[in-house]
Design a protein with these regions (language model features):
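Extended, charge-rich alpha-helical interface modules
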Residues: 1-261
Length: 261
């Protein structure tokens, strides 16, 4: 992000309520499949076979009958139907964060009152029972919800962009992303003033409250985050940023969303 200027206007229209609801239902199936994969680590082969049959004979047909199958990306379709217990670690890691994106969609529909702080994972479990593909009550809540005001969603998108930018900047400082500071400066010498300015402006905008001139994370300055804490911060920001960019129109489909910061 250049001098904290917002991105250009989204190239596509913002998503409608119907589009958000459809994607949320499809993602619910994926989150359920993730739960089965996690449970499979303590299950035997026969139990995993039963779970696989249930996905293929119940979940997939329900998605198809409700015209939701094509709401999933090709990768999601392929991974959803793999035998339970067969996912590679990278697949499990990639899809295990979808509950964060799903929570953003649930929030955008007004079902969740607020998003969690940016160092805290969302817990969608209280409302996941709403997403029963075969449930008779699904139509009732779908007809009763409305998308939040466009300005409120845009504000959340900008906050996500800022937090994702902070994560990427931290990755540069940690040497996880290649970065060459100009004029022979060290990365921290060049990026430090930009970080301080950004944190100050973000505080003025009400996005955060600084700690020692930096973004707050786990009660400390963000720059202190390392290892698991840092990866958690990055994953939260990335998933929310993806969902919010999709909502406001930075991509027609879920898998072609621009994630520039």
């Amino acid at each position: 992000m250049d001098e904290r200027e917002p991105l250009d206007a989204p190239p596509h229209p913002a998503k409608t309520k119907d589009e958000v609801v459809r994607r949320a239902f499809a993602m619910r199936a994926l989150v359920y499949r993730v739960e089965l994969e996690l449970q499979s680590q303590g299950s035997n082969f026969a139990e995993n076979q039963v779970a696989t049959s249930m996905v293929r004979e119940t979940v997939v047909p329900a998605l198809q009958e409700n015209d939701l199958w094509d709401e999933l990306t090709a990768f999601e379709q392929q991974t959803l139907t793999k035998p339970v217990g067969s996912w590679q670690p990278a697949e499990l890691f990639s899809l295990s964060w979808l509950s964060e994106s799903l929570s953003v969609l649930i929030w955008s529909l007004g079902i969740l009152d607020e998003l969690q702080p940016w160092d805290t994972m969302m817990d969608p479990s209280p409302v996941l029972t709403l997403f029963d593909l075969a449930g008779e009550d699904s139509g009732h809540w779908v007809s009763s919800v409305e998308l939040r005001d466009a300005e409120e969603i845009a504000d959340a998108q900008f906050a996500a962009e800022i937090w994702h930018w902070r994560g990427r900047t931290q990755a540069m400082l940690l040497g996880l992303i290649p970065f060459q500071a100009p004029q022979g400066q060290r990365a921290d010498e060049f990026l430090g003033p930009i970080l301080q300015y950004t944190a100050e402006e973000a505080e003025k905008s009400g996005i955060l409250r600084r700690i020692d001139g930096d973004f707050p994370a786990y009660g400390q300055p963000y720059r202190n985050a390392r290892d698991q804490q840092f990866h958690l911060l990055m994953s939260i920001a990335s998933e929310r940023h993806h969902a919010l960019n999709w909502l406001v129109g930075f991509g027609l489909k879920w898998d072609d969303v621009s994630m520039d910061t």
